[in-house]
Every structure is written in C-alpha cells, then in structure tokens.
A protein has these predicted regions:
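Sec/Tat signal peptide C-region and signal peptidase I cleavage site
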Residues: 18-24
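N-terminal (or domain-start) structured segment
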Residues: 24-111, 150, 158, 173-206, ...
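Mature extracytoplasmic/periplasmic domains
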Residues: 277, 281-305
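Amphipathic terminal alpha-helices
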Residues: 308-321
Length: 334
C-alpha cells in the first residue's frame, strides 16, 4: 500500500474522530419535571428548588417541581422511574434512599439505575422541644435507656435521613425509642416544635430556622464534625459524647433514571461542572442551613454516596427491617 495513501487514510480517520462529538448538546423543547417524593418545605424540596433555578438558567427551559410524598419517598421515586425515558422526568432526594429501597422491599431499583447529580451533603441533628428537660445528648440517651420505647422521635419515615440517623444512635447506644413518622422532614420538625413528639433527628437544614428561633433545642450533630449555623453558633458533634460513633455524610441531589438519551446526561454533567459547581445560590444555601456544598456528578457522585448506602442497608438488615439481604444486591457490609 503506497505510503501517501496510508498517510491520507490516517489523517482522514483522525479528523473524523476529532470532528464527531461524543454526544450532542441537549436542548429541551418543553418543561422538565422534577418529582420531589417528599412534602413541600422539607430539605429535599428546599435544595431542589434552588438547584432547579440554576438548571433553568443553564438550559433556557422551565423546570417544574412536583411534590409527591408518601411511603418514605418511594411513591414519587417509582413514578419518576416508570416515566417515559425521554429525559423530561427526574426525581430528587437523598441518594442513599435509591440504594436501599430494594433492601426494604419498597421499590425494585438500585443506586446504579440512576445518574446522580449531587448538590449538598447533609447531616442530621438530634434536637428536642425546649419544654423537655433534656439539655444534652447524654441526658436524652440516658432517659431513653431508663424508659425504653417511651420517648418519641419524629422523622420523615422509614429509610428517611432522620430515621437512619436515629437508628445509628440506637445501634451505638442500645436505646429504644418511639418512632413517629410524617410525610417529610418539615412536618416532622413542626411536630416536635408543636409538642407532638419530644425529639427529632431530622436534617439540620430542616431544623435551622426553628433552632435560630429557639423553638428547638439542638443537642448534637449526628456525626463527627460540629456545625456552625448562621444566626445560632456551634452545634457540637455526637462524637463529643460517643467517640466511636460513625455516620457517613448523606448526599442530596437530582437523579435521572438510566435509559434516557445519552445527550441528556452529557448536558447535565456539563452544567454541573460549569454552572452548579460555581453556584453562589447553592453555596449560600449550604452555609445558611448547616450543609456542605457538594456538586458531584458521574463516577464521583456514585463513589461519594456509597458509604451511606452501605450503612443504611446494613442497619436495616441488622435491625430486622430488611426484606432482601444487602449483599445479594451488591451492597457489601461496610
């Protein structure tokens, strides 16, 4: 084969490889729906609305938030999963839930069935109604030990962030508590403020305004790092009293089911790198609410969320709540 022909062929192939993009830019022609599977006003609803506004600007298309609470988030998530795979229906929430719905027998899906676009990492705070006598995490834990199953704790339901956090405390201390569930973090927090329950273990972002207004007394961040809450001050971590306590970060974000056109995912990944990662609005949200700004996508997002998936799944298994063994779903014990 003549050398000149070979050089021409190679040059042509190289040009073709460079000229053809991996995926075309997605330009939506109608509004996008994000199903928030929790009640309005909760942590998922709050941060999703901030994120949706940034996506609207980047895409030049309306993003509609639809709240569909119920069954610990599985109803709205199922509706997003079963929607047409045209890229116009997403969901949002805590990424750990996607990895544990199947463990709990609530929904046949795994974390790998979704493209993850994270915005913040949240931690829970153990707080009480100010009318209760508890002034520290130790006092509340001691009371739970003295009165097993009597002290009520409000959460957004089984498998919610607040429930997972409280189960981690129960596992570490051996306490039993009365679990009272609500359709979302905000209703759970309001219930504790109203005196329907004595305590809540919901996310700090959901409690922030009530803590600032002295309508809730925060006892400890359910983690190993303190939280500096604007307008209040420092909330000490639970590890101050329980040094060996562990609770992985709980990442929140927007989730797109696999099977949508690849250009949808590629466009969102570009938006996350160029817009969301630089979002002043999201950074301010995180700072004011005691959250961590965490704009991860792709493989980085999957890697970040897996420790929480493991912890949540095996907590369910160890407490007898799991319907399916986590290791059969590709979730090894941490």
């Amino acid at each position: 084969m003549p050398a000149k022909f070979v050089r021409t062929l190679v040059a042509t192939l190289l040009f073709a490889a460079i000229a053809v993009p991996a995926h075309a830019q997605w330009k939506p022609t109608k509004p996008i729906t994000i199903i928030v599977p929790w009640a309005a006003g909760g942590s998922t609803d709050q941060v999703t609305r901030v994120t949706a506004a940034e996506i609207e600007k980047a895409l030049g298309q309306k993003v509609i938030i639809v709240n569909q609470p119920g069954a610990s988030g599985s109803i709205g998530t199922k509706n997003a999963l079963e929607a047409p795979k045209d890229g116009y229906t997403w969901t949002a929430g805590a990424a750990q839930d996607l990895g544990t719905y199947a463990v709990l027998g609530m929904l046949d899906t795994k974390i790998g069935d979704w493209a993850l676009f994270l915005n913040v990492a949240n931690v829970s705070t153990l707080s009480v109604n100010p009318a209760t006598p508890y002034k520290s995490a130790t006092e509340l834990v001691d009371a739970m030990k003295a009165k097993p199953g009597a002290i009520s704790v409000a959460t957004a339901g089984v498998n919610s962030s607040g429930h997972s956090a409280m189960e981690a405390i129960a596992k570490a201390t051996g306490v039993k508590y009365k679990h009272v569930t609500y359709d979302g973090g905000n209703p759970a927090v309001v219930a504790t403020v109203a005196g329907e329950t004595e305590a809540t273990s919901q996310l700090t972002v959901e409690q922030a305004e009530m803590i600032r207004g002295k309508k809730l007394r925060p006892l400890a961040v359910i983690g190993d790092k303190p939280v500096e809450l604007d307008g209040f001050g420092m909330i000490e971590p639970l590890t101050k009293w329980l040094p060996t306590f562990k609770a992985p970060a709980n990442y929140f974000g927007i989730f797109v089911p696999k099977g949508v056109p690849p250009e949808v995912i590629a466009t969102l990944e570009k938006i996350w790198a160029n817009e969301i990662a630089k979002s002043t609005a999201l950074k301010q949200y995180a700072t004011s609410r005691g959250a961590q700004f965490a704009p991860y996508a792709g493989a980085d997002a999957q890697k970040a969320v897996f420790p929480a998936v493991q912890a949540n799944a095996w907590s369910a298994a160890d407490t007898g709540k799991a319907k399916v063994a986590p290791d059969t779903l590709g979730i090894p014990r941490p």
